[in-house]
């Protein structure tokens, strides 16, 4: 690492030892890919000597690397497989909070029986979000795209449905472009609402096979609908998700929140920096945040760029564009 060796700061050395050959190899990754990623992200050098790693770099980075390696090794001991994306998420977590514990985050599982798969949080805020949904009847997830707000809410909803904790899942989105007046659009109802709701269908079909999902939709057990279709209803024994809530008006948000019936949960997700409402219209999500933040039983969870769960190249592309624009 030329940048490392050219630094004028004093370089320090640390040795990290692992007692299990097989787990050490898993930790290092295929072709030592996990170690190369740690070198790149933390700007340190790592030399392998059997089960020992010799780390060289600045002291804060070495402390982070040692903490990271020991915690990842602990996860491997508990049977959690470590991939490069896990290393990447872990570096972000520990760089933001060196006291953070990875086990409670990565070993938390949302089980989806329909696909026999588990979905796990990848950041501290994602873990807080999942716990909040378990513990509260109304949860707001606010933050940028790609932070898992809708996906995790959907996972919790489908998991609850499969475990028969609820009878129905309702997924809603404001249809901003149509001003929620779908009569302006040609075609039948499905054709009218489908473009606005496609992202919700995509997330749904990622969690259950197409036939099962379609069958549940036809039976009304899973409902995907524009926000306007919630008016006048009371939803009992349901898990209700409002996506893109920043594009709801205050009237629509009030209408939506008062649909909540007995034994139901609702999760509202949105990004208050991406409001597409017509000029002069205020966001129902912003008003709800201002009015409801102190009500017991309602939880607000905020996500940041550090929670973005994407292909590493996507993050680099975003960074490159942001750099060019400043």
Label each PLM-derived region with a short phrase.
Residues 113-242, 246-326:
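Conserved helicase motor core of SF1/SF2 NTP-dependent helicases
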């Amino acid at each position: 690492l030329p940048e490392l060796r050219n630094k004028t700061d004093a370089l320090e050395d640390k040795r990290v030892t692992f007692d299990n050959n097989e787990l050490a190899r898993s930790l290092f990754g295929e072709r030592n890919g996990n170690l190369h990623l740690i070198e790149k992200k933390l700007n340190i050098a790592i030399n392998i000597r059997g089960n020992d790693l010799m780390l060289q770099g600045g002291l804060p980075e070495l402390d982070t690397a040692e903490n990271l390696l020991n915690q990842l090794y602990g996860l491997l001991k508990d049977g959690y497989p470590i991939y490069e994306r896990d290393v990447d998420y872990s570096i972000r977590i520990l760089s933001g909070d060196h006291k953070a514990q990875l086990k409670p985050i990565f070993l938390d599982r949302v089980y989806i029986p329909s696909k026999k798969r588990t979905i796990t949080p990848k950041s501290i805020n994602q873990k807080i979000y999942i716990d909040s949904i378990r513990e509260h009847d109304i949860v707001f997830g606010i933050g940028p795209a790609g932070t898992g707000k809708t996906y995790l809410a959907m996972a919790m909803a489908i998991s609850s449905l499969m475990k028969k904790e609820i009878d129905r899942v309702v997924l809603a989105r404001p249809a901003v472009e149509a001003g929620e007046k779908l009569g302006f659009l040609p075609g039948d109802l499905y054709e009218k609402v489908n473009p606005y709701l496609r992202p919700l269908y995509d997330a749904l079909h990622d969690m259950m096979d197409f036939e099962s999902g379609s069958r549940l939709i036809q039976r009304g057990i899973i409902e995907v609908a524009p926000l306007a279709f919630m008016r006048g209803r009371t939803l009992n024994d349901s898990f209700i998700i409002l996506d893109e809530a920043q594009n709801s008006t205050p009237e629509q948000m009030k209408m939506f929140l008062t649909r909540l019936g007995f034994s139901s949960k609702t999760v509202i997700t949105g990004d208050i920096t991406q409001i597409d409402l017509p000029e002069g219209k205020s966001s129902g999500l912003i008003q709800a945040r201002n009015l409801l933040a102190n009500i017991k039983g309602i939880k607000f969870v905020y996500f940041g760029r550090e929670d973005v769960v994407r292909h590493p190249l996507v993050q680099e592309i975003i960074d490159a564009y942001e750099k060019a624009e400043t």
